[in-house]
Amino acid sequence: VTGPRVLARDPEHARALLAAVTAWTAANGLSSAHINFHAADEDALFEDGWLLREDIQYHWTNPGHWQTFDDYLADMDHKHRKNIRQERAKVTRAGITFRVVHGDEASEADLQAMHRFYLQTFMDYGNAPALTLEFLHHLAARLPRQLLLVLAMDGERPVAGALCLRGGDTLYGRYWGGASLP
């Protein structure tokens, strides 16, 4: 969510705060500091040494009348509804099923599979992964009902997954991946 990130009473104090962040980052041997999704009126505060991060986020909101997936489809035109139904039928015919697993239900194999999928996605896109398997174990233990894995299964074998975190009435999905299939 975009909003104020540099909490200071005026631009002079905000620049001093950012200078302190820069100095602390350098003094601690860190490669960078990030202030994401700041308000547009804070743009002028980020001068030399700060890079703009261009990013895209997708937010899906239920207008309140979708209680089922069929309710959701009913709001689409015929072509899109038909395409989605055909895609889902193709997945079903392929024998793929889905498991929804909370952190306290996740087995070692579930966490390892999700971590493999996550690593594969980062390798495919040439990025450095930040999450370790130990971190997934930490999430499962500390956020047992907030951590949610959606695993696509080919028989007993997980072939794809999404890692989500649940908060209140919102589901945050950020990490996903899948096995290479023939």
Please report, for each region that a protein language model flagged, where it lies by residue:
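Conserved acetyl-CoA pyrophosphate-binding loop and the N-cap/start of the following alpha-helix
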Residues: 10-20, 182
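A conserved beta-strand-loop-helix scaffold within acyl/acetyltransferase catalytic domains
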Residues: 22-182
